[in-house]
């Protein structure tokens, strides 16, 4: 049999070539989508209805990636990002898109993913829950980087897809009092003799003040601690040092713990630096209110809240007399949730610790419930959803921070006799591609 030589494609030439492409849509990560040679081309920074000049940077069998060189035809939805760090910082990736267009894109992404992978449509697509587009974050973790040559410590956020630290002077999505702290905080940290021992810095705006948590790998000197106390007093913040064991030392504030309250109730939720909270306070309030409205728990009903954290949903669900069982995988948050329930005067709520990614069949709390709420991390709750047949809630609210895992888990839920009644976007993270969502499933006849 004759064999013929077939030249391999010149990949280096293909990658170096410049193309003019028409962008048709955004993917779920916020990258522009165009097509070339029968393949999808992903272009960060490009928007739908734009014609752009692109240089290919990566070639795969089914897709390519391109670097945006020039916008030849501009989208009417493109805006100028107000943040001076936008093109370097890895935090906000949609500042160049009008906020209403952002929300429309996210809502469409959510519905499309659920329709495609769960192969179902909700009876009702609800209006998005949203708040301020800027300065909405009440919490952020800043990275530090110590330069051995200059002895300078940089304070900022990680660059996109990199461990490099982008030094910042402000943050357009961080609460304004916290953003205003950054320049003076960075200057003060550089005055510390033990600055090499600094890790990340966590800034939090709580209802009872602003908190600065410094992660340290070694004990700081008394002189350094005195500098930190001076900074705390000047800026009216509470400063804590957190060691390798996640133990915190208050430098001022007499051991005061941050908290936030939920409006319309006497519920107050204390939290610690290691505890998860939603970063967008007003949108969190709207989200909790919607979840309670959708489930409408009543006295005498039994409600299960999986991945309950410090009680963000559990306590509001219990305020009208329903028996609520909260289950969480982090021991410290279970303990905090119990404290929060006690201080809020709620005695019909109980909290348990469990690995929600493991077999739950022998858990003492597992049994028939009337209603259920689940708020998992990005990985979703595939394992927990296998227990639905035993739990048999007549209504299930699924709060998700990842539409892909929601779509996957929805398929499991639907196969167990449930119908998707409502779904809606929760715009917890404006200026980014990240989206929160809520879905209501009801057991069919």
Curated annotation (Swiss-Prot):
SUPFAM superfamilies: Nucleic acid-binding proteins, S-adenosyl-L-methionine-dependent methyltransferases. The lineage of its organism: Bacteria, Pseudomonadati, Pseudomonadota, Gammaproteobacteria, Alteromonadales. GO terms for molecular function: 4 iron, 4 sulfur cluster binding; iron ion binding; RNA binding; rRNA (uridine-C5-)-methyltransferase activity. NCBIfam families: PRK13168.1 (NF009639), rumA (TIGR00479). [4Fe-4S] cluster binds at residues 83, 89, 92, 171. This is 23S rRNA (uracil(1939)-C(5))-methyltransferase RlmD. Catalyzes the formation of 5-methyl-uridine at position 1939 (m5U1939) in 23S rRNA. It comes from Shewanella pealeana (strain ATCC 700345 / ANG-SQ1). The active site is at residue 401.
């Amino acid at each position: 049999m004759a064999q013929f030589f077939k030249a391999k494609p010149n990949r280096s030439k293909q990658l170096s070539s410049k193309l003019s492409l028409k962008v048709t849509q955004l993917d779920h990560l916020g990258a522009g989508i165009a097509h070339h040679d029968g393949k999808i081309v992903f272009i960060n920074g490009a928007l739908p209805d734009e014609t752009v000049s692109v240089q290919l940077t990566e070639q795969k069998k089914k897709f390519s990636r391109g670097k945006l060189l020039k916008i030849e035809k501009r989208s009417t939805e493109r805006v100028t990002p107000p943040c001076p760090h936008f093109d370097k910082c890895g935090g906000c990736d949609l500042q160049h898109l009008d906020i209403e267009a952002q929300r429309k894109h996210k809502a469409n992404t959510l519905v499309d993913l659920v329709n495609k992978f769960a192969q179902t449509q909700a009876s009702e697509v609800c209006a998005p829950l949203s708040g301020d587009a800027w300065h909405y974050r009440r919490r952020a973790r800043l990275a530090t980087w110590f330069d051995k040559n200059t002895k300078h410590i940089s304070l900022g956020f990680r660059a996109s897809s990199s461990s490099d630290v982008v030094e910042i002077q402000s943050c357009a999505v961080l609460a304004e009092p916290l953003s205003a702290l950054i320049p003076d905080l960075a200057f003060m940290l550089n005055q510390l003799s033990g600055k090499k021992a600094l890790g990340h810095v966590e800034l939090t705006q709580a209802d009872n003040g602003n908190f600065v948590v410094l992660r340290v790998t070694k004990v700081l000197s008394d002189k350094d601690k005195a500098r930190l106390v001076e900074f705390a007093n000047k800026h009216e913040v509470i400063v804590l040092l957190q060691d390798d064991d996640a133990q915190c030392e208050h430098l001022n504030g007499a051991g005061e713990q941050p908290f936030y309250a939920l409006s319309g109730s006497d519920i107050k939720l204390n939290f610690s630096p290691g505890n998860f909270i939603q970063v967008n306070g007003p949108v969190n309030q709207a989200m909790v209110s919607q979840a309670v409205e959708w489930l409408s728990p009543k006295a005498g009903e039994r409600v299960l809240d999986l991945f309950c954290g410090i009680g963000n949903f559990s306590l509001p669900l219990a305020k009208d007399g329903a028996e609520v069982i909260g289950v969480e995988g982090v021991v410290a948050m279970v303990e905090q949730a119990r404290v929060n329930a006690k201080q809020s005067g709620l005695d019909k709520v109980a909290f348990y610790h469990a690995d929600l990614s493991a077999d739950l069949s022998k858990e003492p709390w597992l049994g028939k419930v009337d209603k259920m709420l689940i708020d998992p991390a990005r990985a979703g709750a595939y394992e927990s959803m296998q227990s639905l047949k035993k739990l048999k809630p007549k209504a299930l609210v699924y709060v998700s921070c990842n539409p892909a895992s929601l779509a996957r888990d929805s398929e499991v839920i639907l196969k167990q006799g449930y119908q998707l009644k409502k779904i809606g976007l929760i715009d917890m993270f404006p200026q980014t591609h990240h989206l929160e969502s809520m879905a209501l499933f009801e057991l069919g006849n």
